[in-house]
């Protein structure tokens, strides 16, 4: 039997609010949803829903382009990016555009091009969104069956899933191609303090790549966030892109197995909840990555990580006091532990003092001073280079402290410089967004499961507490 496409609603859902209010000719009586239910009015209008999604993409890309150009217009090449409140230019610089040795910006034109390309793209998407929302067919099933769908059609849904996976895989390979063939990417570990280089010797060993997933998430291990060389990052994208593309082909060619048909809820709201759950995980992982990882997010552009700034302070004062004659190998601190250097529980030589808790930091300016057993005393006495001193002094004074209202510095310091690290911004915003996406996942999953079980009726307004309360006036 052919499914009827014209059924506006086949969900046992009532959203009782204000039936008299009509919006754009779609009132609650005909759609079953009040104006504030957003795209729920479009659940079975595939053409209009396409318009909403394309327009949303246009808004996202417009923000990217406009913000990109705003950052270019305000950029001062003499100051580090992280001192200028930039969040987009550091991403472009990390991809190797416009920067040279040490992360110095040598050309801002690629950044301008990026902004203009995004603005032009957003105009195309905006036009498409308005067209499909206002002028195009309400439903695609009749005129364009390839793009049409019914939410309950499990085979079509997995085909759409497959197409999305292939697009994600292509996205992963774009980074691979940039790193291999199109000028390379910025490597903060390049000798002498970072440079743009092509990544030639990819890590493709599955034991290495998937070993990250099996690592502990705690200190010294750090799960996938502990990745600290670009060969592993780009090799991981080869694996990820391949898995996404092959998984996409698999989902296009196959129908869901019986266990999947039984286990999952097959409705528009269920798919929304799955997507929100996935985005929530992305948000939390991005939060950890930008906060702790200084390879994927080089400190030259994003500022130092918290542990990095702390270790930089210990290093800076070790250098100063050593010049003033202190024996940094044996000086005792106020607690009886080493003042500058001490041993970790497993025997490595680490920086002493409060920064001991950040013993597992790895940073390009510090690693040359390590030996087989942690920090090497003879290297600390003879091998410290001026660029390492400059880098650590700079990072010491740019710790990622500060709050979302842009009040920078240590909370107890009355004269703090008003500096907020992009790491603070990006980590906090992605954590908060990840959290709200998770709440949305729970909300829509609960509604979708209830609707599938047949007992979702919206809120019962007959016995609402407010009805028995005294009117405000």
UniProtKB/Swiss-Prot annotation:
GO molecular function ontology, one term from the record: chlorophyll binding
Binding-site list for [CaMn4O5] cluster: 367
Propeptide, chain numbering: 1-14
Any one Gene Ontology BP term: photosynthetic electron transport in photosystem II
One Pfam family recorded for the sequence: PSII
SUPFAM superfamilies: Photosystem II antenna protein-like
Modified residues (Phosphothreonine): 15
Transmembrane stretches, start-end: 69-93, 134-155, 178-200, 255-275, 291-312, 447-471
Cofactor note: Binds multiple chlorophylls and provides some of the ligands for the Ca-4Mn-5O cluster of the oxygen-evolving complex. It may also provide a ligand for a Cl- that is required for oxygen evolution. PSII binds additional chlorophylls, carotenoids and specific lipids.
InterPro entries: PS_antenna-like, PS_II_antenna-like_sf, PSII_PsbC, PSII_PsbC_sf
Keyword Nucleus in annotation: no
Function: One of the components of the core complex of photosystem II (PSII). It binds chlorophyll and helps catalyze the primary light-induced photochemical processes of PSII. PSII is a light-driven water:plastoquinone oxidoreductase, using light energy to abstract electrons from H(2)O, generating O(2) and a proton gradient subsequently used for ATP formation.
Protein family according to the UniProt entry: Belongs to the PsbB/PsbC family. PsbC subfamily.
UniProt-recorded name of the protein: Photosystem II CP43 reaction center protein
């Amino acid at each position: 039997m052919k499914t009827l496409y014209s059924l506006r609603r086949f969900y046992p859902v009532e959203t009782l609010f204000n039936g008299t209010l009509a919006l754009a000719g779609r009132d609650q009586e005909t759609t079953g949803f009040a104006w504030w239910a957003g795209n729920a009015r479009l659940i079975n209008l595939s053409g209009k829903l396409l318009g909403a999604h394309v327009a949303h993409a246009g808004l996202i890309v417009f923000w990217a382009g406009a913000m990109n150009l705003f950052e270019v217009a305000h950029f001062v090449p003499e100051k580090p990016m992280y001192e200028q409140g930039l969040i987009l230019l550091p991403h472009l610089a990390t991809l190797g555009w416009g920067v040279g040795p040490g992360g110095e910006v040598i050309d801002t034109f690629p950044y301008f091009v990026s902004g203009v390309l995004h603005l032009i793209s957003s105009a195309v998407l905006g036009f498409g969104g308005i067209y499909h929302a206002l002028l195009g067919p309400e439903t695609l099933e009749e005129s364009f069956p390839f793009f049409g769908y019914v939410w309950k059609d499990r085979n079509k849904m997995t085909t759409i899933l497959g197409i999305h996976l292939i697009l994600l895989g292509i996205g992963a390979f774009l980074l691979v191609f940039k790193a291999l063939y199109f000028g390379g990417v910025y490597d903060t570990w390049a000798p002498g303090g970072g440079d743009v280089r092509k990544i030639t010797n990819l890590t493709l060993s599955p034991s290495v790549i998937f070993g990250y997933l099996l690592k502990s998430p705690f200190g010294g291990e750090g799960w996938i966030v502990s990745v600290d060389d670009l060969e592993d990052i780009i090799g991981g994208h080869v694996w990820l892109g391949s898995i996404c593309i092959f998984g996409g082909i698999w989902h296009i060619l196959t129908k869901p197995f019986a266990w999947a048909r039984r286990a999952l809820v097959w409705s528009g709201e269920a798919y929304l909840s799955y997507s929100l759950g996935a985005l929530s995980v992305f948000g939390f992982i991005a939060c950890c990555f930008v906060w702790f990882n200084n390879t994927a997010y080089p400190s030259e552009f994003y500022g130092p990580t918290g542990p990095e700034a702390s270790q930089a302070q210990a290093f800076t004062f070790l250098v100063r006091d050593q010049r003033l004659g202190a024996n940094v190998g044996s000086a005792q601190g106020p607690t009886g532990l080493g003042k500058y250097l001490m041993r970790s529980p497993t025997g490595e030589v680490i920086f002493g003092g409060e920064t001991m808790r950040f013993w597992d930091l790895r940073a390009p300016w510090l690693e040359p001073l390590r030996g087989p057993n942690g920090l090497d005393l003879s290297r600390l006495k003879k091998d410290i280079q001026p660029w390492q001193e400059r880098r650590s002094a700079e990072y010491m004074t740019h710790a990622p402290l500060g709050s979302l209202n842009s009040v920078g510095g240590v909370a107890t310091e009355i004269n703090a410089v008003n500096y907020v690290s992009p790491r603070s911004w990006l980590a906090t915003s992605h954590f908060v967004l990840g959290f709200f996406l998770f709440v949305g996942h729970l909300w829509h999953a609960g509604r979708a499961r209830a609707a599938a079980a047949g007992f979702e009726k919206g809120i019962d307004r007959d016995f609402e507490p407010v009805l028995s309360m005294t009117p405000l006036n």
